Amino acid sequence: YVLLIAFAILISAGVYAWLKTYVPREPLNCPDGVSIFVKEAGFNSSTGQLIVTVRNNGRFNTAGYFIYVSNNSAQKNPSIEISNYLQEDEQTVKFGNSVLLSLTGDNSFSPGDERINVFNLSTGMGELFSIRIIPTRFQEEENKKRFVSCGNAGVQQIIGEPGMCTSQCTGK
């Protein structure tokens, strides 16, 4: 009987360890107060050039953003991902499907900072209607840097209209 009980305990410990890997972990989230504001977005349909001015109006540094556009006024959420069309410069690079605002791969886009980014889109895309930007950050978990999307801090704006600044636009 002792061997039978020991064998049952051993199997239950193994099953527990195996099932523990199936339990979802808490996802990494950005801190409250992360925010990027689209100050201006202008599109020239003849050249296919989209110029976006973003400003960090939050309380924390960010690393960059995901960017989506729509070319249909009936589409509520922009879904065309355009980071691959980024015109890279000495401060801005592509990072996967996002735009990284630092060559060092850190959260260097400080509150109050502004950046102008140019996207050279194909002229066959048509007229763009709206833009959506979702901030990104590098968060540290278990001594590892993880790239995190701040989906709850995303902003959307109609292209060609100036962004509306609130009292939080100062970054304070």
Protein language model annotation of sequence segments:
Residues W18-K172:
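N-terminal export/assembly leader peptides and their processing motifs that target proteins to secretory
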Residues Y1-Y22:
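N-terminal single-pass transmembrane signal-anchor helix
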